Design a protein with these regions (language model features):
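A solvent-exposed, charged loop/short amphipathic helix patch at secondary-structure junctions
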Residues: 344-368
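Conserved N-terminal ligand/cofactor-binding loop architecture of enzyme catalytic domains
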Residues: 51-95, 99-105, 111-114, 122-213, ...
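Short loop/turn segments at strand-loop or loop-helix junctions that form parts
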Residues: 110-111, 137, 159, 259, ...
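Conserved nucleotide-sugar donor-interacting segment of glycosyltransferase catalytic cores
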Residues: 216-273
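Glycosyltransferase-associated regions of secretory-pathway enzymes
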Residues: 2-55
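A donor-sugar binding/catalytic signature common to diverse glycosyltransferases
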Residues: 232-235, 239, 407-454
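Catalytic donor nucleotide-activated moiety binding site of glycosyltransferases and closely related
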Residues: 193-195, 366-405
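Leloir-type glycosyltransferase catalytic cores
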Residues: 277-324, 451-517
Length: 517
């Protein structure tokens, strides 16, 4: 009774002293006891619970504080270790070569083991019996995986300019020797700038240190292997461009590989890709290459087959987004569809005189051209649809007049267009195949092939767009396009040997004779 609990007190509260087991006449004493204990017990019980909660909360808080503090210290420690490891890796590239590398006739450089699309099988078949080494720019893939896929001896580059190929948010220090190398190689500084713009999570000095590391790493690799030729997949990736610079320094011939301009093919070029290719820079010579009527008819059949099967270099989404776009456009007005490209992987960034000469004469990137085109379309009350490259960000300023076509099937968009426009996107070929007029703002294999409209000066864009709307895809353009495709298939594009009903392009034996002998 000295420390009663509330539930006990409530039992006593309802009892009388006349009940069983309660005897005597001390009723007044019990009432006094109950009254004295009642309020005190409630307060005491509340205070006790509160004290317990406070005590355990304090313990939890202290534990949480110290645990967080401990975790932060551990993270800092781990970050310092990672930072030091990367610093050591970048400063001692010679330590990256565990294998004893032998001399090779050919090096194949790229990340094709990751995306493949028939590239690995083609390379494996084409290089059988040859002295070849694959330099895989896929740090996140195991060497065994790459070798099993290609059936060719391989090494994995420790770091590369792809997502998952580098370390994010790691600050590094530049050594004096690294600063000296950068000063002596302006092109390396430009590549570093591109990396900073493309990969926003690269830490302080990381891009500078990485380009110097790759430059030295590839230099050591070439000295160890002494190849006669190097095949580079997609020259415009930063890692691959550094490899090309080292090849130039070492006087080693490079052949640039990429998917062909029409689906189902590859192309190999000794001079470069897109606006840097032989076809773009020797237009008159290319246009004079002989083709006969049979080759012309074959080109038409190839185009019909591609359109019928809806073949595309990239898998297209299946959805109903095109219906939303149809609802947004004004039915009685012309529709301009503008296709962006991956500016970072198309040789456009950083924008400089080289880009002006070989890629984009007036537009600094996809969004820059979009702003110019949208203003023209708003002024003329034309529908304007923009499909940016999936890897690029949308415009910072969102104009309601710009119809967003992200995630829409490219073929459905082209069918909706009166005119297709692009700087460098291969959608230009897709549009021409489907009989749509194309306005080119930049230089590709289509440069001066007389099958597109060319707006290579900013002041001419509006006038040329208007002409394309009025004149459309003329019969002369159609004939020139068929001739262009016939020449590509005869002299430039190689069958990728992926299973399909209709085969076209040069044979794998042609590739072996022209590039491996």
């Amino acid at each position: 009774l000295w420390q009663p609990k509330a539930k006990d007190m409530n039992v006593f509260k309802n009892l009388t002293f006349k009940d069983d087991f309660i005897v005597g006449n001390n009723n007044i004493g019990y009432d006094r006891w109950f009254a004295s204990k009642k309020n005190f017990q409630k307060s005491n019980e509340y205070c006790t619970v509160r004290k317990i909660i406070k005590r355990y909360y304090k313990k939890f808080k202290n534990f949480s504080f110290f645990q967080n503090f401990k975790n932060r210290l551990e993270i800092k420690k781990q970050k310092r270790i990672i930072q030091q490891n990367i610093q050591d890796l970048f400063e001692f590239p010679s330590k990256c070569f565990d294998d004893v590398l032998e001399k090779k006739d050919f090096l194949l450089v790229g990340h094709f083991a990751y995306f493949d699309k028939g590239v690995c099988r083609y390379i494996s078949n084409a290089t059988q019996g040859k002295s070849v080494l694959v330099v895989s720019t896929t740090p996140w893939l195991k060497k065994e995986f790459v070798q099993n896929k290609l059936k060719i001896p391989s090494i994995i580059v420790p770091k590369a300019t792809f997502n998952r190929g580098y370390d994010g948010n790691v600050d590094l220090n530049l050594t004096e020797s690294e600063k000296y190398i950068l000063e002596r190689n302006p092109r390396l500084k430009e590549i570093s700038l591109r990396m900073k713009l493309q990969y926003k999570d690269m830490g302080k000095n990381y891009p500078d240190k990485m380009v110097v590391f790759l430059f030295q790493y590839f230099d050591i690799l070439l000295k160890k292997t002494s190849p006669k030729k190097v095949f580079i997949w997609n020259k415009f990736n930063a890692t691959h461009e550094i490899f090309y610079l080292v090849c130039l320094k070492s006087n080693i011939q490079c052949i640039f590989m990429e998917f062909g301009v029409i689906p189902g093919t590859f192309n190999f070029d000794l001079q470069g890709q897109m606006g840097e290719s032989w076809i773009a820079n020797h237009t008159s010579d290319f246009n004079k290459l002989e083709i006969d009527l049979g080759e012309l008819e074959n080109a038409k059949k190839v185009l019909e087959y591609i359109c019928k099967e809806k073949l595309c270099r990239n898998l297209q989404p299946r959805n109903n987004l095109i219906d939303d776009i149809k609802r947004k456009i004004k039915k009685d007005r012309p529709t301009i569809v503008y296709f962006g490209q991956n500016d970072f992987e198309a040789g456009m960034i950083p924008y400089n005189q080289h880009v002006v000469k070989y890629h984009s004469p007036w537009s600094i990137d996809s969004n820059d051209a979009c702003r110019v085109l949208s203003e023209i379309c708003i002024k003329n009350d034309w529908n304007f649809i923009y499909k940016p490259h999936p890897n690029l960000e949308w415009l910072e300023e969102k104009k309601s007049e710009i119809i967003d076509a992200r995630g829409v099937d490219i073929h459905e968009l082209i069918d909706l267009a009166d005119v297709a426009v692009t700087i460098l996107s291969q959608s230009s070929y897709e549009a021409l195949m489907r009989g749509k007029p194309v306005v080119m703002l930049g230089y590709t294999h289509l440069k001066h092939k007389n099958c597109t409209y060319e707006a290579f000066a900013k002041d001419d864009v509006e006038q040329i767009l208007d002409k394309a709307i009025k004149d459309g895809f003329t019969e002369e353009m159609r004939k020139n396009f068929h001739s262009h495709i016939a020449r590509l298939l005869k002299y430039y594009l190689y069958d990728d040997y992926v299973a399909r009903k209709f085969k076209y392009g040069k044979k794998i034996e042609d590739f072996q004779n022209e590039f491996l002998n």
